[in-house]
Amino acid sequence: MKTKTIVTAMLLATAYVLLVNLMFLSGFGKDEMVKVGWYSEFGGNSTTTLCPLYVWLNFPYTVCFYFFTTLFFAKVKVHVNKWLGETAFVLWCVSLVPILVNTVYDLYMVSSFDGDEMYRSLENYWETEGKSDYPFMWLLLSSRVGNNWNWMNDLNYYGNWALWAAFLAFAIVFALLFKKDKVLGIAGATVMVVSILLNMFPLPCGYIAIDLCWIALCAAVLWRLRQSSFDKPFVLP
């Protein structure tokens, strides 16, 4: 697939989710929430609260952006040292696993439940008929009960580290591409570093800044493609 097609899809997906994020930042759609979890008669509780409309609107972005970004990184990695490029790409692919699991988890909850109907007693429901009524939901909730292995937490924890490592590796990749194309090298490395910092140290509305950075990177690549000629072709065909 041509770079122009890939980057255009990334740009449209990011512009779309930026609009969605701005809408929900203003409070749009937050009057209807889904609350799933448990509370114990002996103390303690665990809940997950989601906005169904946001989950459904975010789904097309998740599919489109991560698919085409993976294709984009696959093109970028071949222009540097094979070991570095492959390591960065593998780390990126590993980081997608928790994103996929969380997306399926969120879609399952908002499509199966309404309001707070599934915020129920641990002893009187989830540890009895809840196990058979909603086995997938119990699998997710049980990881947060007592001393059980919190596999969801571990998955997200190591997934975040893989994502940070992938961004760091690709920051180096883009920095090495500076000699071949200054605009791509600077824009790519900057977006990777900003993504690392705002993921490690979240700020209010930091995700808006990340969206804007990716839009800037896509715009820079499309601009360089437009300038490309037979004599001076762009580094990414």
Map each language-model feature to its residues.
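Hydrophobic, aromatic-enriched alpha-helical segments typical of multi-pass transmembrane helices
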Residues: 2-236
